[in-house]
UniProtKB/Swiss-Prot annotation:
UniProt-listed GO biological process terms: lignin biosynthetic process
Reaction catalyzed: D-mannitol + NAD(+) = D-mannose + NADH + H(+)
Function: Oxidizes mannitol to mannose. Provides the initial step by which translocated mannitol is committed to central metabolism and, by regulating mannitol pool size, is important in regulating salt tolerance at the cellular level.
Co-factor remark: Binds 2 Zn(2+) ions per subunit.
Protein's recorded name: Probable mannitol dehydrogenase
Lineage: Eukaryota, Viridiplantae, Streptophyta, Embryophyta, Tracheophyta
Oxidoreductase recorded as keyword: yes
Length: 359
């Protein structure tokens, strides 16, 4: 007879879980492992709400196992360390992102590319040693030290939480594909959780940044608040035509199905388009503009642990955080409804510790 999530491991834990494809979250008692020799135990203070949390809750990608406790933008304080842990101490502010385990022996792991390990264990909804992982919509987590990162002292913990997914998701491809040369022109397609952080990275790298959006009412915010240099309404044919061949790079953060062809037209010769938005349906693409303009389309999946630490340190140096709306856990279902409607500027973050302190 299978054990229940509440009793299968030694440590009692509490969070909010969805039980079915309605995606509705409610209180959930489960259990976590004891802190091992290489582990770090973290009391969760804040957890960002990622669009992939919503996809997983609804089983949009077809691999959700219920009950599921989402959350992979975790910031908290260390409460216990194993005897082999030298990098972290009790009381440190730390982060836990999208992955909590990998094989640690393959070529990718040996190159600090754990996110491309063929056997990754994600922070939630992954099988792991006979049980499943549960994420950061909960009171604490136990993680192998390799998958924990130090949080810079000058970054606010709540507004820094989304950097652990949204931040590294745009930082890693910008670095890998060389989209960092000062003075070059970066297009940011989509102004949401990923896009607004991409603007900030672009400006920190010294790029000219243009936001590409279907929503003209976002222009003032993009330029005056987030620091973009210009704004391009993608459903305005005349403005799109005038902007053709003007951009060196585009990072496409759009999570809805859309055609890549208009974006390719904006690129110069040798331009690079990198997509990170994970639409649930295939995107329209013709190879002709790639061949004719020697253009590149690429993708990227979060970042390895070494690069995630590098990204956080970069954010600390340049005072980069996410723009957030702080919520309590009991508000999470309303937040998910709003996220589905893109009604957030620009990332929800759950005040986990204060949500559970009265329980």
């Amino acid at each position: 007879m299978a054990k229940s999530p509440e009793t299968e491991l030694p440590l009692k834990a509490f969070g909010w879980a969805a039980r079915d494809t309605s995606g509705t979250l409610s209180p959930f008692h489960f259990s976590r492992r004891e802190n091992g020799d290489d582990d770090v135990s973290v009391k969760i203070l804040y957890c960002g709400v990622c669009h992939s949390d919503l996809h997983t809750l609804k089983n949009d990608w077809g691999f959700t196992t219920y009950p599921v406790v989402p959350g992979h933008e975790i910031v908290g304080v260390v409460t216990k360390v194993g005897i082999n842990v030298k990098k972290f101490r009790v009381g440190d502010n730390v982060g836990v992102g999208v992955i909590v385990e990998s094989c640690q022996t393959c070529e990718n792991c040996n190159q600090d590319l754990e996110q491309y390990c063929p056997k990754p264990v994600f922070t939630y909804n992954s099988p792991y040693k006979g049980t499943r992982t549960y994420g950061g919509y909960s009171d604490f987590v136990v993680v192998h030290q390799r998958y924990v990162v130090q949080f810079p002292d000058n970054l606010p913990l709540d507004a820094g939480a989304p950097l652990l997914c949204a931040g590294i998701t745009v930082y890693s491809p910008m670095k890998y594909y060389g989209m960092t040369e000062p003075g070059k022109h970066l297009g940011v397609a989509g102004l949401g959780g990923l896009g607004h952080v991409a603007i900030k990275f672009g400006k920190a790298f010294g790029l000219k940044v243009t936001v590409i959006s279907t929503s003209p009412n976002k222009e003032t915010e993009a330029i005056d608040k987030l620091g973009a240099d210009s704004f391009l309404v993608s459903k305005d044919p005349e403005k799109m035509k005038a902007a053709m061949g003007t951009m060196d790079y585009i990072i496409d953060t759009i999570s809805a199905a859309h055609s890549l062809m208009p974006l390719l037209g904006l690129l110069k010769l040798n331009g690079k388009l990198v997509t990170v938005g994970l639409p649930s349906k295939p995107l329209e693409l013709s190879v002709f503009p790639l061949v004719a303009g020697r253009k590149l389309i690429g993708g990227s999946n979060i970042g390895g642990m070494k690069e995630t630490q590098e990204m956080l340190d970069f954010c600390g140096k340049h005072n980069i955080t996410a723009d957030i709306e702080l919520i309590k856990m009991h508000e999470i279902n309303t937040a998910m409804e709003r996220l589905h409607k893109a009604d957030v500027k620009y990332r929800f973050v759950i005040d986990v510790a204060n949500s559970f302190s009265s329980l």
